[in-house]
């Protein structure tokens, strides 16, 4: 099988991106030139080869250390785990090109927010979010209403104006979690999922969807998690969220035939419902599995009412 790093280099070069394989902070990475060679982006391919959890966790620890060093020196890298590349290749390739400056532009001011059904959210997130849909109570969609300025002219020239009315982003939120602070009840909601079309750079989309949810539900606060495989969560800070705690890494079992990623706790629960297994069995290698431990996440909270 071709190495993941070679697959990425080949794909970027096929799309006109000048890149090279280099060493950064102990990792073999792809250094891609963007903005006509004026700057570069670091891509970190993550081969999934661990045949037990100890190896997977050790790899994750070393990866986290290297990513921290790379971030300080070159900016946060683009991290591409092998299972994502093989199982969700179309989405991953589109997102990778978007990071390289190859994208369609849309602005939230030219879009409208609508409530959508759970089924609509499920389909969109299955196609455009790394983890797909998760249980949510409130589902919102952002629909393209019009193009303006140079974007409109570009769409007309490329005969792409027919995507007006298209669903281009989705945000979902949980039901309320309630607790009492002093003499008042606080209602907190989780921002569960957000995704936009991977080939489109959407300016202001997250903010517009969040404002619609706040206007409808009037929460006391909204919390969410930034997936550290994608970013450090700067977009949440720009929306007024405050960083809180780190979310621990999650262990996954990977089926190399399908590259499906299954959390170890789910795998163990499914097994133990059929047969009684000793606790340590959940960490024993299956002969047909690889293991991967992700980078965890960072928790963010937006407080909309004054409480301690």
Predicted regions: what they are:
Residues 18-33:
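A short, well-structured beta->alpha microelement
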Residues 1-22:
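Acidic-basic catalytic patches of nuclease active cores, encompassing PD-(D/E)XK
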Residues 72-75, 218-222:
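Short, high-confidence coil segments that cap the C-terminus of an alpha-helix
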Residues 83, 91, 95, 100-220, ...:
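A conserved beta-strand-loop-helix scaffold within acyl/acetyltransferase catalytic domains
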Residues 55-87:
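Catalytic cores of nucleic-acid endonucleases
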Residues 31-37, 143-145, 302-304:
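Active-site beta-strand termini and strand-to-loop segments that position acidic
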Residues 225-287, 293-307:
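Active-site/acyl-donor-binding loops of N-acyltransferases
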Residues 34-61, 176-177:
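Short beta-strand-loop-alpha-helix junction that forms the active-site gateway
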């Amino acid at each position: 099988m071709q190495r993941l790093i070679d697959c990425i280099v080949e794909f970027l070069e096929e799309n006109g991106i000048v890149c090279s394989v280099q060493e950064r902070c102990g990792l073999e990475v792809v250094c891609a030139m963007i903005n006509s060679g004026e700057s570069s982006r670091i891509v970190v391919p993550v081969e999934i080869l661990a045949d037990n959890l100890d190896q997977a966790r050790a790899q994750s620890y070393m990866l986290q250390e290297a990513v921290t060093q790379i971030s300080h020196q070159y900016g946060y890298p683009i991290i591409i785990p092998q299972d994502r590349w093989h199982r969700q290749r179309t989405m991953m390739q589109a997102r990778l090109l978007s990071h390289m400056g190859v994208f369609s532009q849309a602005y939230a001011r030219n879009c409208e927010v609508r409530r959508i059904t759970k089924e609509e959210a499920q389909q969109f997130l299955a196609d455009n979010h790394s983890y797909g849909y998760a249980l949510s109570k409130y589902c919102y969609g952002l629909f393209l209403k019009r193009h303006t300025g140079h974007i409109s002219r570009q769409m007309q020239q490329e005969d792409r104006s027919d995507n007006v009315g298209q669903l281009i982003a989705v945000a979902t939120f949980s039901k309320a979690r309630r607790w009492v602070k002093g003499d008042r009840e606080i209602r907190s909601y989780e921002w569960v999922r957000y995704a936009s079309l991977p080939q489109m750079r959407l300016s202001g989309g997250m903010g517009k969807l969040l404002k619609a949810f706040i206007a409808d539900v009037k929460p006391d606060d909204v919390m969410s998690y930034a997936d550290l495989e994608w970013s450090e969560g700067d977009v949440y800070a720009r929306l007024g969220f405050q960083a809180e705690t780190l979310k621990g890494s999650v262990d996954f079992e990977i089926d190399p035939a399908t590259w499906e990623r299954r959390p170890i706790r789910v795998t163990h629960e499914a097994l133990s419902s059929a047969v009684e297994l000793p606790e340590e069995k959940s960490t024993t290698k299956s002969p047909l599995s690889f293991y991967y431990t992700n980078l965890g996440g960072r928790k963010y909270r937006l407080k909309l009412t004054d409480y301690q």
